[in-house]
Amino acid sequence: MKNFTELRVQIDEIDQKLISLLQERSRIVQGVKTIKDSTHNQHFQLYIKPDREYSILKKIINTVGNYGYPKEFFYRTWRGIISASNLLEQDLKLLATCSKSYNDIYQHFGMQSLPVIEENSHKAFEMLQTNIFHILAFQTNNSKIFELLKNNKEVKIFAIIKTQERQNYTFLCGKISLETFSSPAVVVTTQETNKILNKEASIFLSEDFEINDNTLGCFYPAVI
């Protein structure tokens, strides 16, 4: 039977291997960045691929099983790795409309980039449109942002951050292509469905995946 010292040495060795693997992963991400930089035009667009992120997280959760660390730990760990990779690929500036959405986007991106709060929804959206900031976090009860999204073809919702502590969730939006979204993604739409999200702004959710002129964005459901 091994003693504490031997076991701790093993743990330290595993930690070093994990660090080396993460450093290697970051170098690969830099290679991905180079390719994306060469293929994107001059008009800013987020490199983030929600479909790829959903696929990675789902595969991780399905792989780990029920032994050892809980699935929530693996989800948070890989969510942090993915977000760190997002920031390696692009120098992203984060914006939030309130303290709640600030905390959510700060946690979502692994506390690696400090967001800025702009409570004026029109000003916040304008700074997103003009690329002063690149991702905007807002609460699902913010009807002003929904109204601005209705008249915009570039800025789209691409993620939702859910918390157990409150009813209103946080949406993330930015200049992103919706082409990569597919089922089981959920559509945020102005077309009336049986799942209303914001009555004041006439915004709905649709699980019948279809991107059309009424689509304000899409997001994937949680994998755990």
Question: For the regions a protein language model found, what residue spans apply to each?
Answer:
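Domain-level signature for soluble enzymes in the chorismate/prephenate branch of the shikimate pathway
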Residues: 1-224
